């Protein structure tokens, strides 16, 4: 396939806001590509040349791309810079100035050159990147150049999510979504949709079934549902294991021989943050190849008191890591093992995985196994919960004893019970920032005064609004919000956002914030859950807690289904409170 033809599909996707139409366009595209192209096209749809967990970035600013355009299009740099200020989109500038009708490269040729650009480093690499990008711009159709430039700048933003791509892969083969579960299972244990698509194109469903857990490929993490009372846990699980819930940094640690990689909840490779943990893994899992999960949490070495998440995540800064290790030492509380010496343990029941974890771990200071109790008594669960709260922890997680580890799934195999605050929702909501409103009055100087936030509809692959928030952040945080959001602002509402509210500035759904609210109410202006009866759901008196939650991506946000469940729990609690007063 020529890159110009792929660009035409990108154009069609960009012009539609209908998910089914988008899926059908993708399915039509996939039917036309072969096994050497399918993985590359999947990566390019996400504006990348590798899966998300691989730290491969183009590293080219607007200025460098303008240099490449000037070189390729033979237009003076000053003229391009002036035009860019007027147009605001370097992709559209390529269309305006390119005279390359009739020229083109294949998708594979274009992808391979982009991959080379992303991997160039060292002395002379900047000029080499500019020259290679100029070659591509000069070799592609104007429309192809438009999308090429957007890919390099990280501004492709077609609004295509992984669920839509998985549906389209199935539809391309059998004209329905029937193969989606096989594709999704393979994706959940590899986190690499390009690889999964290539295997599917080469060997069909049987090849997908043969995909196994591999050390080095992060597994999409299992997630817990929520309830508001210990009695509900027993009602759903019966006899179960109960563990503390830490306010830490959830880690998935992969060790093969002497190599260790540490992935965050949103599958970022954060190994650099934890040199002390890497050392501990090598010591406490000697001669074992493992994938384990746990919660890393910083503590005060003098008092033993745990610090909140915001302290642990300070290690995300790529400088002074050794200083942070000394200042904020951390403990890893391991709670699961997903692979051990060649065996995929995800299909084993919880109780067997726990035994294998205990057998594999050598005792040491840095890594310990999360304590647990096994009970069918709600009073014992409540007592354990209160003990955890007294220790400054978030709450508890209950786990079904016979449940496998279900990668990428949120269900009632795991149930969390978190601290409830008087007059507040029993749990916070992880919201995605969708846009912002310019400040008025005192906040006019910041250029930002409120955020439009939403939650994720995982059935429709859309982000839906749930609140406009103007309280919580400090003045310094408002300034930081403006800086990071302006880097991802877009001209119009993104295709994967459903909203009746028009903020002053739309942004790509990327950043997650933790929101506390008093309750969930019905709303005619918000789109969360509105397809049920025409009324949406909204957060009453919402406020942002802290800054951006860096360990979570947009698809890790609270879902519409969770909001509906929280609303039902809230109504149930009110009925019970009222009956207590009678």
Swiss-Prot record:
Its EC number is 6.5.1.1. InterPro entries: ATP-dep_DNA_ligase, DNA_ligae_ATP-dep_bac/arc, DNA_ligase_ATP-dep, DNA_ligase_ATP-dep_C, DNA_ligase_ATP-dep_cent, DNA_ligase_ATP-dep_CS, DNA_ligase_ATP-dep_N, DNA_ligase_N_sf. PROSITE patterns: DNA_LIGASE_A1 (PS00697), DNA_LIGASE_A2 (PS00333), DNA_LIGASE_A3 (PS50160). CDD domains: Adenylation_DNA_ligase_Arch_LigB, OBF_DNA_ligase. ATP binds at residues 243, 250, 265, 295, 335, 410, 416. The keyword Cell cycle applies. The active site is at residue 245. It catalyses: ATP + (deoxyribonucleotide)n-3'-hydroxyl + 5'-phospho-(deoxyribonucleotide)m = (deoxyribonucleotide)n+m + AMP + diphosphate. It is an enzyme of class 6 (ligase). Gene3D superfamilies: DNA ligase, ATP-dependent, N-terminal domain, DNA ligase/mRNA capping enzyme, Nucleic acid-binding proteins. One of its GO terms (biological process) is DNA repair. Its cofactor is Mg(2+). SUPFAM superfamilies: ATP-dependent DNA ligase DNA-binding domain, DNA ligase/mRNA capping enzyme, catalytic domain, Nucleic acid-binding proteins. Keywords: ATP-binding, Cell cycle, Cell division, DNA damage, DNA recombination, DNA repair, DNA replication, Ligase, Magnesium, Metal-binding, Nucleotide-binding. One of its GO terms (molecular function) is DNA ligase (ATP) activity. NCBIfam families: dnl1. HAMAP family: DNA_ligase (MF_00407). DNA ligase that seals nicks in double-stranded DNA during DNA replication, DNA recombination and DNA repair. Belongs to the ATP-dependent DNA ligase family. PANTHER family: DNA LIGASE 1 (PTHR45674:SF4), DNA LIGASE 1/3 FAMILY MEMBER (PTHR45674). This is Probable DNA ligase.
């Amino acid at each position: 396939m020529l890159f110009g033809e792929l660009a035409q599909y990108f154009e069609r996707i960009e012009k539609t806001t209908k998910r089914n139409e988008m899926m059908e366009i993708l399915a039509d595209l996939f039917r036309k590509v072969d096994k050497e192209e399918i993985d590359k096209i999947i990566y390019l749809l996400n504006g990348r040349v590798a899966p998300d967990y691989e730290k491969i970035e183009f590293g080219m600013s607007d200025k460098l791309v303008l240099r490449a355009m000037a070189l390729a299009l033979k237009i003076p740099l000053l003229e391009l810079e002036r035009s860019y200020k007027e147009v605001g989109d370097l992709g559209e500038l390529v269309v305006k100035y390119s005279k390359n009708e009739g020229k083109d490269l294949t998708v594979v040729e274009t992808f391979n050159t982009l991959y080379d650009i992303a991997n160039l480093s060292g002395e002379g690499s900047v000029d080499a990147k500019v020259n290679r990008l100029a070659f591509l711009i000069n070799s592609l159709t104007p429309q192809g150049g438009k999308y090429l430039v957007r890919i390099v700048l990280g501004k492709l933003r077609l609004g295509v999510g992984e669920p839509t791509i998985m549906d389209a892969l199935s539809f391309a083969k059998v004209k329905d979504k029937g193969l989606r579960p096989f594709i999704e299972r393979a994706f959940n244990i590899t986190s690499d949709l390009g690889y999964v698509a290539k295997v599917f194109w080469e060997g069909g469903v049987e090849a997908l079934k043969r995909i196994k857990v591999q050390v080095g490929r992060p597994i999409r993490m299992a997630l817990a549902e929520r309830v508001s009372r210990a009695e509900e846990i027993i009602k759903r699980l019966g006899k179960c294991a109960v563990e503390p819930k830490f306010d830490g940094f959830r880690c998935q640690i992969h060790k093969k021989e002497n190599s260790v990689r540490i992935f965050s909840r949103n599958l970022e490779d954060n190994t650099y943050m934890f040199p002390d943990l890497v050392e501990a893994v090598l010591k406490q899992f000697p001669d074992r190849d493992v994938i384990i999960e746990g919660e890393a949490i910083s503590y005060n070495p003098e008092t033993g008191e745990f610090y909140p998440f915001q302290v642990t995540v300070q290690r995300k800064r790529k400088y002074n890591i050794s200083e942070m290790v000394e200042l904020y030492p951390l403990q890893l509380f391991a709670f699961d093992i997903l692979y051990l010496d060649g065996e995929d343990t995800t299909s084993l029941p919880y109780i067997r995985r726990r035994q294998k974890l205990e057998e594999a771990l050598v005792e040491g200071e840095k890594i310990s196994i999360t304590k647990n109790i096994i009970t069918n008594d709600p009073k014992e669960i409540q007592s354990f919960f209160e003990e955890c709260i007294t220790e400054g922890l978030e709450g508890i997680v209950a786990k079904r004893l016979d449940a496998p580890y279900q990668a990428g799934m949120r269900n009632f195999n795991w149930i969390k019970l978190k601290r409830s605050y008087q007059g507040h929702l029993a749990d916070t909501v992880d919201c995605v920032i969708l846009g912002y409103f310019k400040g008025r009055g005192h906040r006019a100087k910041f250029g930002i005064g409120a955020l439009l936030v939403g939650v994720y509809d995982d059935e429709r692959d859309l982000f839906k609004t749930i609140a406009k928030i103007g309280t919580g952040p400090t003045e310094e945080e408002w300034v930081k919000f403006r800086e990071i959001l302006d880097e991802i602002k877009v001209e119009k509402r993104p295709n994967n956002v459903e909203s009746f509210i028009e903020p002053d500035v739309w942004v790509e759904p990327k950043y997650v914030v933790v929101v506390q609210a008093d309750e969930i109410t019905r709303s005619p202006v918000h789109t969360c859950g509105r397809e049920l009866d025409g009324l949406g759901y909204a957060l009453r008196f919402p406020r942002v807690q802290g800054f951006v939650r860096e360990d979570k991506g947009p698809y890790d946000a609270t879902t519409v289904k969770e909001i509906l469940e929280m609303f039902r729990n809230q109504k149930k609690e009110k009925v019970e409170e009222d009956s207590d007063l009678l």
